[in-house]
């Protein structure tokens, strides 16, 4: 990946609330299925904004920090997804999204960020990201001290 796109906590909340607005009215949803781990924080924000208390997870491993690898389903939520929002932070090449679509064909699949290769696989997203850009999520970063340029 050539470029980086840094996401702050504030940006993530703004984008997730924008997505929640599009998912109203909340009464149409039975619950939320968060794709672990990237979808966990966005799912919490959606659950709050939509007043949804039923939140489940599907646990799929496809990344090792910044490298994609083979998909492995560690845990799945029951059913075909009917009446559920499935949320992940990002749709990238579409590998995880394809597996999600197969598991939950009747779910409404949304992400905060979408790259061109994966866009056709989601029902809605908020932010377009170029394919060659790595997203640094706020839960993967920490604020650290940086010495002044003068060295004093």
Swiss-Prot record:
5-phospho-alpha-D-ribose 1-diphosphate binds at residues 37-38, 69, 88-96. It comes from the Bacteria. Pfam families: Pribosyltran. Its main location: membrane. The keyword Lyase does not apply. Its EC number is 2.4.2.-, 2.4.2.22. It is a peripheral membrane protein. GO terms for biological process: GMP salvage; IMP salvage; purine ribonucleoside salvage; XMP salvage. Mg(2+) binds at residue 89. Pathway: Purine metabolism; GMP biosynthesis via salvage pathway; GMP from guanine: step 1/1; Purine metabolism; XMP biosynthesis via salvage pathway; XMP from xanthine: step 1/1. It catalyses: GMP + diphosphate = guanine + 5-phospho-alpha-D-ribose 1-diphosphate; XMP + diphosphate = xanthine + 5-phospho-alpha-D-ribose 1-diphosphate; IMP + diphosphate = hypoxanthine + 5-phospho-alpha-D-ribose 1-diphosphate. GO terms for molecular function: guanine phosphoribosyltransferase activity; hypoxanthine phosphoribosyltransferase activity; magnesium ion binding; xanthine phosphoribosyltransferase activity. Purine salvage pathway enzyme that catalyzes the transfer of the ribosyl-5-phosphate group from 5-phospho-alpha-D-ribose 1-diphosphate (PRPP) to the N9 position of the 6-oxopurines guanine and xanthine to form the corresponding ribonucleotides GMP (guanosine 5'-monophosphate) and XMP (xanthosine 5'-monophosphate), with the release of PPi. To a lesser extent, also acts on hypoxanthine. This is Xanthine-guanine phosphoribosyltransferase. It comes from Yersinia pestis. The gene is gpt.
